[in-house]
Amino acid sequence: WIMGHMVNAIYQTDEFVNLGANSIETDVSFDDNANPEYTYHGIPCDCGRSCLKWENYNDFLKGLRSATTPGNSKYQSKLILVVFDLKTGSLYDNQASEAGKKLAKNLLKHYWNNGNNGGRAYIVLSIPDLNHYPLIKGFTDTLKQEGHPELLEKVGYDFSGNDAVGDVAKAYKKAGVSGHVWQSDGITNCLLRGLTRVKEAVANRDSGNGYINKVYYWTVDKRATTRDALDAGVDGVMTNYPDVIADVMNEAAYKNKVRLATYEDSPWVTFKK
């Protein structure tokens, strides 16, 4: 999965997919009442990027639905996965469940079209704080209550705080999650970060009894870092430059080892070599 980083304006979706991304990451900010409000990152953000692009969250979802609904004039068949980077740092811990409920209702209405031929992309809810694990239950319970438990087949989870792998496992246990787990590791492109924890996450994924299904590394903009990440065995790379990642994947060392994921590749099934 080549994951376009910080895609917060609707027009950027096409831009990133046309450069080679089959997945995008979008920031979601919340208002004081835990309503998802804007797709907005703000300052500071990655070096070399504008931090201030934004849409109303519901408008973004409608645009995303168009881009991921076959038959729509704006349909992009390559776009198969969307990571919502949930900026829950602005919320009190006791609002996490409420944020999950509201997120579920927004997605159900504006993205899934109330279960009636909505967008087809897989969704990853990425949460920065392990204490906000109740967001997951708020989300899953709401989809069930609204009569659409089948849509949970399209939803996965990520804790993005670079916490110890064992602590992340405990948070999932509390949230009642087994499966559909992506594990992120990374840092802004302005700084360097080694691959120690990525390798630990990959080992958990491949152990046969770990909690992780897929591992992604962010933010990767350089060819050398891309090679290191691919060598470490990641499933996804989040980047500001999808074309760079696509180029590296076409190099002799990689072109027979890795390929771009398609819609038929389940993002929840651990790849067995």
From Swiss-Prot:
So which cofactors does this thing need?
Mg(2+)
User: What are the binding positions for Mg(2+) in this chain?
Assistant: 25, 27, 85
**Segments forming a coiled coil:** none
One Gene Ontology biological process: lipid catabolic process
One Pfam short name: GDPD_2
Which cysteines form disulfides? Answer: 45-51, 47-190
List the InterPro entries hit by this protein, alphabetically.
Answer: PLC-like_Pdiesterase_TIM-brl (IPR017946)
One GO MF term attached to the UniProt entry: phosphoric diester hydrolase activity
Write down the chemical reaction(s) this protein catalyses.
an N-(acyl)-sphingosylphosphocholine = an N-(acyl)-sphingosyl-1,3-cyclic phosphate + choline; an N-(acyl)-sphingosylphosphoethanolamine = an N-(acyl)-sphingosyl-1,3-cyclic phosphate + ethanolamine; a 1-acyl-sn-glycero-3-phosphocholine = a 1-acyl-sn-glycero-2,3-cyclic phosphate + choline; a 1-acyl-sn-glycero-3-phosphoethanolamine = a 1-acyl-sn-glycero-2,3-cyclic phosphate + ethanolamine
Keyword Hydrolase belongs to the record: no
Membrane-crossing residues? none
What Enzyme Commission number(s) appear in the record? 4.6.1.-
Q: Which UniProt keywords apply?
A: Cytolysis, Dermonecrotic toxin, Disulfide bond, Hemolysis, Lipid degradation, Lipid metabolism, Lyase, Magnesium, Metal-binding, Secreted, Toxin
Q: What does this protein do?
A: Dermonecrotic toxins cleave the phosphodiester linkage between the phosphate and headgroup of certain phospholipids (sphingolipid and lysolipid substrates), forming an alcohol (often choline) and a cyclic phosphate. This toxin acts on sphingomyelin (SM). It may also act on ceramide phosphoethanolamine (CPE), lysophosphatidylcholine (LPC) and lysophosphatidylethanolamine (LPE), but not on lysophosphatidylserine (LPS), and lysophosphatidylglycerol (LPG). It acts by transphosphatidylation, releasing exclusively cyclic phosphate products as second products.
Q: What is this protein called?
A: Dermonecrotic toxin LhSicTox-alphaIA2avii
Q: Which organism is it from?
A: Loxosceles hirsuta
